[in-house]
Each structure stands twice: as structure tokens, then as C-alpha cells.
Amino acid sequence: MADKKVVGVIKLQIQAGAANPAPPVGPALGQHGVNIMEFCKAYNAATESQKGNVIPVEISVYEDRSFTFVLKTPPVVELIKKAARISKGSPTPHNLKVAQITPEQVKSIAEAKMVDLNANDIDAASKIVRGTARSMGVTVA
């Protein structure tokens, strides 16, 4: 496995358990020569328990057209939308506030995202989550 050469890394955000060969998955994998259906089946099996979430995936493609993938945690935006029970953020976040979340919800989102965030402790991760919420028009109170 160590002597395989990586020829490409593809980053996608796909609905859990709902990967199919249609865009954006098909074209992104097709240009690297990956078996699209094989990836879709593997991804759907790996994300079966997380249906309803958008799960980022990082796919490493090797020179023999084989691949491996790593699943990440759902994006902060998706977690905030779920916590606030909204479908999208505010079109004008500084003027129009669309929802409110509690500091406890911010902390739980920060704990869930800690492995993927560039933060040293939970307070720094909470600040990142608060900033994302602010740019979506969601207040923390």
C-alpha cells in the first residue's frame, strides 16, 4: 500500500447515504478514472448511520485507479442550521437575524468539530463556531 503513488486528491461534500454517479460525484471521480459506482457503494455503506447530514469526504486516487477515502465531520454551517432549526442562513446577516442558538449548543458543535478545526482548545473552537453563526445571521444568547 505504501508504494502506491497518489495522483489526485478530491474533496467533496455529499449527503450521507445518498452518493450517486450524477454531478458533482460522477465528473469529479470520472476525470481521475475511478470506478464511480464502487465509490458510491462504499461511501453510502460508510455513511448509512448518518443519514440527513452532509458529510465531507477526501478521496485519494492512486496511479492504478484505486482509491481510499476519509470521512470528515459535518460542516459547522450544517450543524448550526440543524441546532437552530433553519433551512438557510440570513441573506443580510448584519441586518436580519434569522435564529438564535444557546452557548451550550455552540459548545456541543465545537466539541463535535474539534477534530477537524484548527483549534487548540474548546474555547478557540467555540469562537470559530460563533464567528460562523454570526456570518449566517444566527445570534448566540
From Swiss-Prot:
Disulfides per UniProt: none
Similarity-based family: Belongs to the universal ribosomal protein uL11 family.
Keyword RNA-binding: yes
Post-translational modification, as annotated: One or more lysine residues are methylated.
Function statement: Forms part of the ribosomal stalk which helps the ribosome interact with GTP-bound translation factors.
Organism: Tropheryma whipplei (strain Twist) (Whipple's bacillus)
Protein name: Large ribosomal subunit protein uL11
Record's keyword terms, sorted: Methylation, Ribonucleoprotein, Ribosomal protein, RNA-binding, rRNA-binding
Entry-linked Pfam families: Ribosomal_L11, Ribosomal_L11_N
Subunit structure: Part of the ribosomal stalk of the 50S ribosomal subunit. Interacts with L10 and the large rRNA to form the base of the stalk. L10 forms an elongated spine to which L12 dimers bind in a sequential fashion forming a multimeric L10(L12)X complex.
One GO term of the biological process aspect: translation
GO terms under cellular component: cytosolic large ribosomal subunit
